[in-house]
Design a protein with these regions (language model features):
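Bacterial Sec-dependent N-terminal signal peptides
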Residues: 1-37
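Detector for outer-membrane/organellar transmembrane beta-barrel domains
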Residues: 174-253
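Charged helix-capping and loop-helix junction motifs
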Residues: 228-231, 262-266
Length: 319
């Protein structure tokens, strides 16, 4: 009997233990479900990590310097750069030894000082012995070619304003101060195709406030040139070593004048570059150091061998 009572008392105890375990398990399950429900009830975090924006990497050294023989290149130096330029054009070579192929003939020279106060913007001042001209110029890089190809070209805008400072007399025909001014505007579009080869094309627009005319048989003053002139320039660079490139350009006036059309220019030469200097020596048939003078008045004909020797020297300092 004791065994039966003992056995009988064990079964309810075991049952109570099992029931307690089941209840605890059920409570734990309910608590877990409640916690899960609470977690599920929380609004999902919809914020995502900001995408990593890669900084654009621009193509460098499309050309070696500011000049491409007689034309501006697409390049604008880095911020804080001072640049001093000396440009020289000798006389034409067709007279041979009589003037040492133009080296001892009359020559044009220009000095130019420029500075880059902010990124992509260059301002400059120049002076030339040609008609005692002084000029102010601005160059702004609008678009730059990227290495990943997202921007395939560089685009730069160049503008100058030139003042003829010669004394007014019957040869200069200056009546008003505004008669002394001329202007030049150019959009330069360039692409660096490889580490060694670059091309650029540049449509330009020039304007002279005052131009000489002539009298016809009736005594009426007639224009020789239009006051506005359009032209297209094409230039290229082929790098042959770390410090040397072959350079060339072609300038084609577009506007037809009433009496005297300008002749196109063909130039080719060598560009030698160091860390702080750029030196170009070349032969071509543009004799002026003013782009608007060249596109308006050039009469040197390359078909007749009317070429001249010229050079550009640039010295750069960065602060």
């Amino acid at each position: 009997m004791k065994k039966h009572n003992s056995y009988s008392s064990f079964i309810p105890g075991f049952a109570r233990g099992c029931l307690l375990i089941v209840l605890c398990s059920g409570f734990g399950s309910v608590m877990a479900q409640d916690t899960t429900a609470k977690k599920a009830a929380k609004p999902a975090d919809t914020s995502a990590e900001a995408p990593v924006v890669k900084k654009k990497s621009f193509v460098k050294n499309t050309f070696e310097g500011n000049y491409l023989i007689d034309d501006q290149s697409v390049m604008v130096p880095i911020k804080g750069t001072f640049e001093f330029d000396i440009q020289h054009r000798f006389g034409t070579v067709q007279h041979g030894f009589s003037d040492a192929f133009g080296l001892f003939a009359g020559a044009n020279m220009k000095l130019n000082l420029s500075y880059v106060p902010v990124n992509n913007l260059q301002i400059g001042l120049g002076a030339s012995n040609e008609n005692m001209q002084v000029d102010g110029n601005i160059k702004f890089a609008i678009i730059r070619q990227t290495k990943d190809g997202s921007m395939p070209v560089s685009v730069t805008y160049y503008v100058n304003s030139i003042m003829d400072t010669r004394k007014a007399d019957n040869t200069t025909l200056f009546v008003n101060t505004s008669d002394r001014f001329s202007f030049y505007n150019e959009i330069i579009i360039a692409r660096k195709f490889s580490e060694n080869f670059s091309l650029q094309i540049s449509p330009s627009y020039s304007h002279f406030n005052n131009l000489q005319g002539y009298q016809d048989a009736s005594g009426k003053v007639m224009p020789i040139w239009n006051h506005d002139n359009f032209a297209v320039e094409l230039g290229g660079k082929l790098k042959v070593s770390d410090g040397m490139s072959l350079i060339a350009n072609y300038d084609q006036p577009v506007t037809q004048n009433p009496a005297q059309n300008p002749r196109p220019n063909i130039s080719f030469g060598i560009d030698m570059r160091t860390s702080g200097h750029d030196f170009q020596i070349f032969i071509g048939n543009y004799g002026s150091l003013s782009p608007q003078n060249n596109t308006f008045f050039n009469q040197n004909d390359y078909k007749k061998g009317e070429f001249l020797i010229g050079f550009n020297i640039s010295r750069l300092w960065n602060f």
